[in-house]
């Protein structure tokens, strides 16, 4: 009897330890290592997330950093409470609907609007770190900066993926002098793969923030530097003020939650459009037997594409900053509205035209053309107590605005607004306004199984493909019973509007003839996808990273687990 009791007790302890197994997944192994270092020191998921964000600002400067912002959802294991953090960049108070109009009185094109100072929003990432550290951190603030500061000071090697971005960017005409010297050789060619680059300016800046706190950035000397940098830009100067920086605050709106086949899915609230639109895609598919169709069915992918088109159309029409416009989230997710939208989808044909619907609570706005999005970094962490942080951070386009200060790049987030404020005589929801935050595709999500157990923490990078990446992965996990790794690795059909893209060299692209028979007109092209996740199966935490990226998952042993590119092969078996 005593033996059986002791055995049961030990099994309980083992199961509890496994369930709370510390782990991270991030877009770069050096960032993952920074997160694991914090977990080894007894830090929380919040501590690990901060260390990873700081490290990504060093080794992924094309995508994120203190010059940007993002969204994070946090699960407190003790209370079960979910907190959604909105650290999206904000427009200066002086901004208005004509912010991106040129000297000719006409709206700029996106390529003309990005470079310089006017596209820069008030950064939110550092205030995000401050908020989650105050709410959930255990380690000292300055401890969180140590790994990233060392990376910046001692140097980091240029990776093939990062080098590819450098070769696609012109060394002159976009970057300022510091950036050109940091990333390019004197002859204007990108520094080679494997070159170790050092960023003493950023190392010093991290040191100052570690000592003086975030106010050094928002009300101290760095605030004056930032304002001078964007207002003094030789191209597209801004009208940002010190007051814009001093007044910036992280919001904590209620998470957006919904159900799909008994699973509860929760994520960041608008202006993050991702969780709402992911839920729409899934809910519109719920009347179809996606499990029976399976991942290798052209009909399943056709249905996914059609549901995506409808949801993206509603995104472009209705999603924006809820502090400035009425955003009908409840109406978009209402069962009667979902039923009406889903009824437009047919398994045997493609819709001739795509238009937004009219959900309950919809204001009088017009759908506008979506703005292109490119950058972002995604990360997730779980600590020994079972707390979970899932974040997506960004400076928007690759290298943001091209403007830099203190060794970091400043965002071009304001070009996520609609550059044209009106369409057909009506204002667009996502137009520029002073203090407003632009719509985002970011989709940090937590998923609970029908028994209420945490099943998945997932996010992605890659602009507007983020929504499709995450929705596809959830169909894979929930309907097709794939592991999170296989669901992320499987190919994507990205269809934000008429037509779409079947990802090159994947099973989805191989279905093109059959999809054409259903009326789909698709291109085939590579997609720069970058999802990551941690899933829980039978009480065991398992990390997942995208084989298309340089991302990894990592446990306390410090070993980076990177999926092989072969995981994209079309005949990979299901689990």
Named regions from a protein language model:
Residues 1-9:
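Bacterial N-terminal signal peptides that target proteins for export
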Residues 10, 14-17:
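N-terminal signal peptide c-region/cleavage motif recognized by signal peptidases
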Residues 21-33, 37, 43-46, 50-269, ...:
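Noncatalytic scaffold domains of N-terminal-nucleophile
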Residues 58-65, 69-84, 236-241, 387-450, ...:
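Active-site rim segments in enzyme catalytic domains, especially the processed small/beta chain
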Residues 252, 373-376, 440-442:
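Short, small/polar residue-rich loop motifs at catalytic or cofactor-binding pockets
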Residues 266-275, 376-380, 390-402, 459-467:
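Glycine-rich phosphate/pyrophosphate-binding beta-alpha loops
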Residues 287-394, 403, 546:
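Internal maturation/activation junctions in enzymes
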Residues 435-437, 470, 479-526:
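Extended C-terminal subregions enriched in glycine
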């Amino acid at each position: 009897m005593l033996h059986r009791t002791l055995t049961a007790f030990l099994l309980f302890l083992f199961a509890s330890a496994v369930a709370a197994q510390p782990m991270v997944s991030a877009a770069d192994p050096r960032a993952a290592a920074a997160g694991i270092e914090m977990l080894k020191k007894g830090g929380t998921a919040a501590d690990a997330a901060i260390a990873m964000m700081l490290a990504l600002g060093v080794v992924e400067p094309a995508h994120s950093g203190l010059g940007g912002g993002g969204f994070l959802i946090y699960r407190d294991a003790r209370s079960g409470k979910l907190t959604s953090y909105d650290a999206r960049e904000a427009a200066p108070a002086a901004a208005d609907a004509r912010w991106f109009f040129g000297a000719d009185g006409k709206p700029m094109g996106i390529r003309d609007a990005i470079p310089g100072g006017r596209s820069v929003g008030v950064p939110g990432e550092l205030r995000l770190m401050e908020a989650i550290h105050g709410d959930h951190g255990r380690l000292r603030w300055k401890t969180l900066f140590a790994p990233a500061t060392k990376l910046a000071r001692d140097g980091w090697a240029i990776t093939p993926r990062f080098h590819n971005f450098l070769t696609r960017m012109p060394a002159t005409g976009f970057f300022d002098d510091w950036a050109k010297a940091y990333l390019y050789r004197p002859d204007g060619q990108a520094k080679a793969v494997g070159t170790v680059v050092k960023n003493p300016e950023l190392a010093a800046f991290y040191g100052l923030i570690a000592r003086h706190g975030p106010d050094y950035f928002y009300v101290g000397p760095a605030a004056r530097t930032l304002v001078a940098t964007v207002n003094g830009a030789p191209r597209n100067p801004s009208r940002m003020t010190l007051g814009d920086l001093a007044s910036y605050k992280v919001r904590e709106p209620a998470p957006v939650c919904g159900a799909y086949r008994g699973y509860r899915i929760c994520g960041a609230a608008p202006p993050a459009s991702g969780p709402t639109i992911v839920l729409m895609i899934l809910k519109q598919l719920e009347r179809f037997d996606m499990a029976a169709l399976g991942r290798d069915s052209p009909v399943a992918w056709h249905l996914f594409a059609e549901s995506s088109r409808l949801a993206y159309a509603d995104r472009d029409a209705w999603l924006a900053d809820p502090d400035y416009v009425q955003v009908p989230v409840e109406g978009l997710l209402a069962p009667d509205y979902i039923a009406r939208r889903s009824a437009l989808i047919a398994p045997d044909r493609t819709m001739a035209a795509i238009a937004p619907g009219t959900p309950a609570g919809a204001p009088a706005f017009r759908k506008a053309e979506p703005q292109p999005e490119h950058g972002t970094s995604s990360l997730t962490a779980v600590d020994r107590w079972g707390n979970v942080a899932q974040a997506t951070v960004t400076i928007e386009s690759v290298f943001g605005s091209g403007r830099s200060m203190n060794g970091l790049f400043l965002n071009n987030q304001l070009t996520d607004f609609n550059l044209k404020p009106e369409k057909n005589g009506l204002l667009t929801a996502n137009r520029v306004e002073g203090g407003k935050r632009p719509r985002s595709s970011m989709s940090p999500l937590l998923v609970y199984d029908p028994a209420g157990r945490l099943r998945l923490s997932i996010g992605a990078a890659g602009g507007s493909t983020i929504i499709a990446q995450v929705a596809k992965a959830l169909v894979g996990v929930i309907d097709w019973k794939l592991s999170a790794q296989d669901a992320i690795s499987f190919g994507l059909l990205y269809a934000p509007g008429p037509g779409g893209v079947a990802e090159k060299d994947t099973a989805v692209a191989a279905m093109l003839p059959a999809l054409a028979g259903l009326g789909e007109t698709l291109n085939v092209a590579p997609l720069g996808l970058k999802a990551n996740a941690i899933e829980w199966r039978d009480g065991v935490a398992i990390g997942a990273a995208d084989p298309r990226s340089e991302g990894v998952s990592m446990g306390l042993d410090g070993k980076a687990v990177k999926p092989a590119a072969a995981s994209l092969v079309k005949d990979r078996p299901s689990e």
